[in-house]
Amino acid sequence: MHSSPELLLEARGIRKSYHKDKIELPILRGIDVGFVTGEMSALVGRSGSGKSTLMHLLATLDQPDSGEVWFDGTRIDNQSRARRDQYRNSQIGIIFQFYHLLPELSAIENVLAPAMIRRSVLGYLRDRKSLRLRAEAMLDRVGLLTRSHHQPSEMSGGEMQRVAIARSLMSNPKLLLADEPTGNLDTETGATILSLLRELNREDELTIVMITHDDSIAETADRCYRMCDGLLEDNASNLAGGDRSDSAKLETVAA
């Protein structure tokens, strides 16, 4: 008898609405989904399907109207803001489509920036040497150590995304959330970023949840979930085993 896979991250009955001019706009309408430890999963859907809103809830950047978010066996959506921030800062790395690098800082300074912000001046001065060594190691991990003193204006889009990935790894997170990580890149550069994410997943055993509108990108994941109009349409497509030429095709299951 096979045991169920261990879930690192889970959404249970998640609902979320926003209000405009006294009109309620439902964005998520009851999402149940789990992400397996050590796997690379994809949430795929068109713009407006609710996938980015779900990612914000999974990252504790926002709270659901109802439902629960569980991380590594602990419910986190109902924690205090300070506690949610602590979870996110220590356990969850996040990258976005547009990198969000500070233009006046070098690559290594951008990687160090979150660690600087989270510490007092004295705390940063105390930990400065070890933090810099960690930042250098993360830039080396993404193949950009030789560009550590270049500013974003001196880097390509792919290089800037690599810096963003290095920054997300500074806290040695268990989970990486990637919101359209190749959406601002050409096809060839996007493929190199996907290859890097897969390498981090397989070699470093980093659990990754990737948000995308592109089926071809979603098909590189171990499991794919399709969202439409705030609902999860698909059963997970397990792409880890079997013939990928067949299994890598997303099946649309009627909601």
From Swiss-Prot:
Pfam families documented for this protein: ABC_tran
Keywords: ATP-binding, Cell inner membrane, Cell membrane, Membrane, Nucleotide-binding, Translocase, Transport
Compartments (UniProt record): Cell inner membrane
Domain ABC transporter intervals: 9-254
Highest taxon above the source species: Bacteria
Protein name (Swiss-Prot/TrEMBL): Lipoprotein-releasing system ATP-binding protein LolD 2
UniProt keyword Cytoplasm present: no
One CC-aspect GO term: plasma membrane
Function in brief: Part of the ABC transporter complex LolCDE involved in the translocation of mature outer membrane-directed lipoproteins, from the inner membrane to the periplasmic chaperone, LolA. Responsible for the formation of the LolA-lipoprotein complex in an ATP-dependent manner.
Species for this entry: Rhodopirellula baltica (strain DSM 10527 / NCIMB 13988 / SH1)
Disulfide bonds: none
SUPFAM superfamilies listed in its UniProt record: P-loop containing nucleoside triphosphate hydrolases (SSF52540)
One record GO biological process: transmembrane transport
EC number: 7.6.2.-
GO molecular function: ATP binding; ATP hydrolysis activity; transmembrane transporter activity
Membrane-topology descriptor: Peripheral membrane protein
Positions with a binding annotation for ATP: 45-52
ATP-binding keyword on record: yes
Oligomer status and interactors: The complex is composed of two ATP-binding proteins (LolD) and two transmembrane proteins (LolC and LolE).
Record family assignment: Belongs to the ABC transporter superfamily. Lipoprotein translocase (TC 3.A.1.125) family.
